[in-house]
Amino acid sequence: VTLKKKTLRKVEVSAEICSEDHEYNMDWPSDITLWINDVEVGTWESPSDFGGRRGKLNPAWWSSDKTQYGMLKNWCVKRDGSFLDGEKLSDAGLEKYNISDKDYISVKIGIKEDAAHKGGINIFGDGFGDYPQDIVLKLSY
């Protein structure tokens, strides 16, 4: 994949995420999937809608009986495959995601219709949860 005479080596998407239930529920799994350009990268099974302690970054006005934090997940696509937190998910490399065929990169995080665990999703941004970041899309050349 080449963009302006540079070769793309890696695409990474990271975000603090967890399941979603009313208020919070420590036993509430959800199969959370990432797609790039409408091609599935992989699914992570979130174990919980995390609560029971305050998120490290949550503002004072955020009620303690609500979801508090998530887990920082990192999807990565390289030439030799697709990975989640360093573990290989598949052999699907950069070419499969048609990145050079478009003027943009589409990223979707959600729950598949046929997911075994349809426990919803919370996506945290900078200032909430435990990690001081928004959703990050990183391209490495």
Regions found by a protein language model. Name each.
Residues V11-V13, G93-E95, D101-D114:
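Short, well-structured beta-strand segments within conserved domains
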Residues P47-S100, H117-G119:
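Extended, solvent-exposed segments with strong compositional bias
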Residues K112-Y141:
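Proprotein-processing/basic-patch segments
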